[in-house]
């Protein structure tokens, strides 16, 4: 059991570290579009050259051979992977073709870059929401515990009401009440506030119980 937890913790720490180091680990900006490489396949590194020799890791760029079917084929060109070039851990000479470790999406954006930068945003939402829930829970639980009486009863009734609400339906209801198109900062703060609003009652009840004891 301890070994399983250690492995899980190491994997989680690795994912968090990769997300935090996204600007160094990703070969492209997450919003950069490659119009000639829409839905391009992943381009994995190779260690064995065409003549069977073990060489420095290289990548075979892909080219679009059928624009109608969006079909790509790997070229015979062997482009070596470079270390720490232009502030990026791993990259290739883009004059010989771009490198997409996990391919591209329908808009021609690098999936690997978007995955790591998206993870940063998700981790930020989780951190801000947890901090908001903690602060709100401490405030409400502290007031309820020290005040007592009807105020305590009212605050804990609100906390109980929030606890019984399915969080997913609260998120959907709030999203439906907002404009159809939201900017990234608006989405970030909306998710953070909703998740904080769903999490503060647990903290509040715990703080109130500690004070009352």
What is each of the regions a protein language model found here?
Residues 1-134, 138, 142-143:
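Gly/Trp-centered helix-boundary motif
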Residues 107-213:
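Alpha-helical transmembrane segments of integral membrane proteins
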